[in-house]
């Protein structure tokens, strides 16, 4: 990996991780657990939630030890796989490298929470009427955006041979 690609990874990751951790800290110090502040009435709240599971509450019903092991292991594995893929594509596929850096940063952002709290701070709460999309955070958003970029490259055969 050349220096420019490494700088791109570090810069994008640092910005996303810092924004993720800063927003989570702000929510945790401003709102008590489960408190909501309406931002757009009938559509969007800031709600302090501690998510013991994964996306959509995956594994939330398992013991804290099982969850912690599973998510720490999987998050670490994903981060390493993304770094491996980034190293192989960053010089030739610039847009893909931004997407991979976003996935990496999101995984690390949530991994920090799992190390610190054994669960993840979520707070972005979108809803329509009684239907609530599961709350999420900046790290989750980065992972989602990065995955959209990655899937685009896969679908349109823009991922290089590895």
Curated annotation (Swiss-Prot):
Disulfide bonds: none annotated. It is an enzyme of class 3 (hydrolase). It is a multi-pass membrane protein. The active site is at 122, 140. It catalyses: Release of signal peptides from bacterial membrane prolipoproteins. Hydrolyzes -Xaa-Yaa-Zaa-|-(S,diacylglyceryl)Cys-, in which Xaa is hydrophobic (preferably Leu), and Yaa (Ala or Ser) and Zaa (Gly or Ala) have small, neutral side chains. One of its GO terms (biological process) is proteolysis. Keywords: Aspartyl protease, Cell inner membrane, Cell membrane, Hydrolase, Membrane, Protease, Transmembrane, Transmembrane helix. Its main location: membrane. Its EC number is 3.4.23.36. This protein specifically catalyzes the removal of signal peptides from prolipoproteins. Belongs to the peptidase A8 family. This is Lipoprotein signal peptidase.
